[in-house]
């Protein structure tokens, strides 16, 4: 598999999401969605940059949203093309097939060769136990860097928590932490995440 996709690599340092003290990094998985533009608007109003770990969508509206994310100065990351756990975790080759498809789509639509990625389900999950170490080694060899998360909005389920629950949950778990990576979802059902975002940003800033 090291011979597969010779143009599927990046050079130079990947963004370091966890090295700065007193910094909480905001990340959004599974977009773009009907809410992407609204998330971007809140982030602009609060003067905050985020990382969007996106999936593969080829409709024109989604392509435009990829471009909006980049134009607004945010980091575009890969979260797999298909988000199909059984498919992508079959083998290293299957993983590369899927992520190369997304890498190529994002490069064509935005001009960006994204260097960061996130595993669906996290880097170690019940679907990839036999293959995750090989996947990580191969992706790192190609210059990519993956990021899990340390704080979650718990908003992946179709029935999302209330905005207050999202905000209070993250702020409570952030107590005593000098840094962290916050997981949220940019999905059509995550209206309460959008509602929570302004207060969450203010609350994290108050904590320093």
Which residues are covered by each model-predicted region?
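Active-site glycine-centered loops adjacent to acidic/histidine catalytic or metal-binding residues
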Residues: 29, 79, 120
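Generic beta-sheet signal
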Residues: 23-25, 50, 178-184
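Ser/Thr-centric signal marking residues that sit
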Residues: 27, 36, 51, 80, ...
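Residue-level preference for short coil/turn positions at secondary-structure junctions
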Residues: 19-21, 46, 72, 113, ...
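Short, well-structured secondary-structure segments
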Residues: 25-26, 44, 48-56, 70, ...
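Catalytic domains of cell-wall/extracellular-matrix polysaccharide-remodeling enzymes
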Residues: 60, 83-205
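N-terminal pre-catalytic segment of deacetylase/amide-hydrolase enzymes
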Residues: 1-26, 32-47, 61-67, 164, ...
């Amino acid at each position: 598999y090291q011979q597969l996709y010779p143009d599927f690599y990046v050079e130079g340092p990947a963004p370091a999401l966890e090295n700065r003290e007193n910094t909480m990094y905001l990340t959004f998985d599974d977009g773009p969605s009907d809410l992407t533009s609204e998330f971007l608007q809140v982030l602009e109003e609060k003067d905050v940059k985020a990382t969007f770990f996106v999936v593969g969508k080829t409709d024109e509206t989604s392509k435009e949203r990829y471009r909006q994310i980049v134009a607004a100065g945010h980091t575009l990351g890969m979260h797999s093309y298909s988000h199909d756990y059984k498919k992508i975790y079959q083998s290293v080759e299957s993983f590369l097939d899927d992520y190369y498809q997304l890498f190529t789509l994002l490069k064509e639509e935005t001009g960006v060769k994204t260097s960061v990625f996130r595993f669906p389900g996290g880097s170690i999950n019940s679907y990839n136990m036999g293959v995750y170490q090989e996947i990580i080694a191969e992706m790192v060899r190609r210059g990519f860097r993956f990021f899990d998360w340390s704080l979650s909005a718990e908003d992946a389920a179709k029935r999302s928590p209330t905005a207050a629950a999202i905000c209070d949950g993250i702020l409570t778990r952030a107590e005593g932490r000098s840094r962290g990576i916050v997981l949220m979802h940019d999905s059509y059902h995550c209206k309460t995440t959008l509602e929570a975002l302004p207060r969450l940003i203010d609350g994290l800033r108050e904590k320093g």
